[in-house]
């Protein structure tokens, strides 16, 4: 097929896009702005804004007109209040980050061989393994993004610890920037994974014995 990315320049571009996608996806894992909660003042809970992340939640509350306090709580594996989409995203995003790291490692090895014009089976296999790992990383990221996006759209609640003084559901819930960053990182991971997976050794890379003239 004509869209196979077999040239060195094309594969180096693929590697650059893969790196961008991996960085965006890995960065989103540490961001806290996955779900934004806006909470009004009630008799049970004080007003404030909460950023619900995959590994922690940060709560911002205005004490005076010029003072805002911030409190962050990092989830532990003993926390049973975490909903399915967050528990799943914790595992999926970490797995995707590891897969993406090793996918880049195999891609670098294949590019090294290509730059040295070593078009052998090891080069082909490295591109294929890199493609599989990058696609798997992209799929894991995509599932985590879609699950948490769906939770925001459907206004799903979370039963936080009483000490956090947060309601089960906020008055307003919005999609945070972390979901957008993770979503942007999915596309290059999937596309570059496809290009690497279907890499074909160019005909000129095949080694033929030379014929000496008498």
Swiss-Prot record:
Keywords on record: Cell junction, Cell membrane, Membrane, Tight junction, Transmembrane, Transmembrane helix
Origin: domain of life: Eukaryota
GO annotations of cellular component type: bicellular tight junction; plasma membrane
Keyword Secreted applies: no
Cytoplasmic compartment residues: 1-11, 102-125, 199-214
Gene Ontology terms, MF aspect: structural molecule activity
Coiled coil stretches, renumbered: none
InterPro entries for the chain: Claudin
TM ranges: 12-32, 81-101, 126-146, 178-198
Subcellular localization, as worded in the UniProt entry: Cell junction, Tight junction; Cell membrane
Biological process, per Gene Ontology: bicellular tight junction assembly; cell adhesion
Membrane topology listed for this record: Multi-pass membrane protein
Membrane side Extracellular: residue ranges: 33-80, 147-177
Subunit structure: Can form homo- and heteropolymers with other CLDN.
Protein family according to the UniProt entry: Belongs to the claudin family.
Function: Plays a major role in tight junction-specific obliteration of the intercellular space, through calcium-independent cell-adhesion activity.
Protein name: Claudin-34
Organism for this UniProt entry: Homo sapiens
């Amino acid at each position: 097929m004509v869209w196979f990315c077999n040239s060195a320049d094309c594969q180096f571009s693929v590697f650059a896009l893969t790196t961008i996608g991996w960085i965006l996806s890995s960065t989103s894992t540490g961001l806290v702005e996955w779900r934004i909660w806006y909470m009004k003042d009630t008799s049970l809970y004080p007003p404030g804004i909460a950023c619900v992340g995959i590994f922690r939640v940060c709560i911002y509350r205005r004490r005076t007109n010029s003072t805002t306090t911030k409190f962050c709580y990092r989830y532990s594996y003993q926390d049973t209040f975490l909903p399915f989409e967050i528990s799943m995203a914790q595992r999926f995003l970490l797995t995707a980050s590891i897969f993406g790291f090793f996918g880049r490692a195999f891609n670098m090895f294949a590019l090294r061989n290509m730059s040295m014009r070593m078009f052998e089976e090891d080069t082909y296999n490295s591109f294929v393994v890199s493609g599989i790992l990058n696609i798997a990383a992209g799929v894991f990221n995509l599932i985590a993004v879609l699950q948490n996006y769906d939770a925001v759209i459907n206004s799903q609640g979370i039963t936080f610890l009483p000490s956090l003084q947060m309601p089960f559901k906020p008055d307003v819930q919005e999609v945070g920037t972390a979901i957008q960053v993770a979503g942007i990182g999915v596309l290059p991971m999937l596309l570059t994974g496809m290009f690497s997976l279907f890499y074909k050794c160019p005909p000129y890379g095949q080694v033929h014995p030379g014929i000496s003239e008498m």
